Amino acid sequence: MNKGRVTQIMGPVVDVKFDGGKLPEIYNALTVKQSNENGSMNLTFEVALHLGDDTVRTVAMSSTDGLVRGTEVEDTGKAISVPVGDVTLGRVFNVLGDAIDLDGELPADVHRDPIHRQAPAFEELSTKVEILETGIKVVDLLAPYIKGGKIGLFGGAGVGKTVLIQELINNIAQEHGGISVFAGVGERTREGNDLYHEMSDSGVIKKTAMVFGQMNEPPGARQRVALTGLTMAEHFRDEQGQDVLLFIDNIFRFTQAGSEVSALLGRMPSAVGYQPTLATEMGQLQERITSTNKGSITSIQAVYVPADDYTDPAPATTFAHLDATTNLERRLTQMGIYPAVDPLASTSRALSPEIVGEEHYEVARQVQQTLQRYKELQDIIAILGMDELSEEDKLVVHRARRIQFFLSQNFHVAEQFTGQKGSYVPVKNTVSGFKEILEGKYDDLPEDAFRLVGGIEEVIENAKKMMA
């Protein structure tokens, strides 16, 4: 076993000297196991740089409090490896793949995969573009997700990012029998705890593996925890042929953690103080998230935008990789429209006639045109009232309000709060429902009948009850 000694400690960055000229490889995991009067210490470092002939610079995966120079360090001879397979479902892990829930240790012989690996080879990639049906009307109609695609989820605090994530996990599990992996990267521990309990209550946890590296942890853990989650997802894709959902909350914290250690590793900062390797690190992570001939990983990434500045290097680098964006809007929550997805700001490169078909594309564009015209007319309505509008514009407003309400629906995972049964709406029902509204087939039904329903048949039922 190759052993070295700690020579320098700079917060989360630790230098280790190896005698005999046998240096551990880049990305190898080094461990410290020792006991002293302050208790036992069990640390893992990852090799980041080689300094000269006998010293490596490493990044710690947990706090270095109590570590002293001269401490003996062992080279494990391999990268950090984490458990993979069905044994991970329903469990919660840290960056090293240790179980941190209260359900006991994993079996000793559990299969482990290294967190660093190459993106799939070019010839393994799947070229066919396939839509991932979510059962959520506003997403499927206006900003559809692609299997193996990357989706950015934008929204402030309390607008429903977590509930939307839970519903997606639920629908993929129930309708497609799919598996989800949730990576909590640098977010609040309280939110992770709440999510775990909510998912346990709704029964979704049985089809989900969860990995956390939260705000209070050192940057090494926050930077690598996304790779831990991704490695678990890759196993389900490559070994079991699954279509996996990978949730990363929040992708900005991955970049932020990299920038924290970058200067300590001796790199010159680049724009806005970010690490010079920002685009490379992001690319290495994102390129592994893709569809292959065996299965797919579809990634939904919450994106925090610092100071709402979309030109900041961190969100700007993320955008380059996204196939679709789902924007959540507080204004819609205030109107009681859930999910509060902004139908005009959300985009998808899959919304083209070649991918979704001519009818779907036409209906989606007409819905957006109607809503856009309604938005333009709102100032006139606020100042002069509805009576000043032309008959044509009155009809636009009339239909736009019905469309706006019909874009809302009840979620399965929110049943315990709302008391209303959740609904999963197939894409073809969604398209035909909106097409009929645009054609004026339901102009005579009260607009409240369209609120928080599934398919168009529920609207007709509601209207009958209201008119009875």
Swiss-Prot record:
GO terms for molecular function: ATP binding; ATP hydrolysis activity; proton-transporting ATP synthase activity, rotational mechanism. Its main location: membrane. It catalyses: ATP + H2O + 4 H(+)(in) = ADP + phosphate + 5 H(+)(out). Belongs to the ATPase alpha/beta chains family. The gene is atpD. It is found in: Cell membrane. F-type ATPases have 2 components, CF(1) - the catalytic core - and CF(0) - the membrane proton channel. CF(1) has five subunits: alpha(3), beta(3), gamma(1), delta(1), epsilon(1). CF(0) has three main subunits: a(1), b(2) and c(9-12). The alpha and beta chains form an alternating ring which encloses part of the gamma chain. CF(1) is attached to CF(0) by a central stalk formed by the gamma and epsilon chains, while a peripheral stalk is formed by the delta and b chains. ATP binds at residues 155-162. This is ATP synthase subunit beta. Keywords: ATP synthesis, ATP-binding, Cell membrane, CF(1), Hydrogen ion transport, Ion transport, Membrane, Nucleotide-binding, Translocase, Transport. It comes from the Bacteria. It comes from Bacillus cereus (strain G9842). Its EC number is 7.1.2.2. Pfam families: ATP-synt_ab, ATP-synt_ab_N, ATP-synt_VA_C.
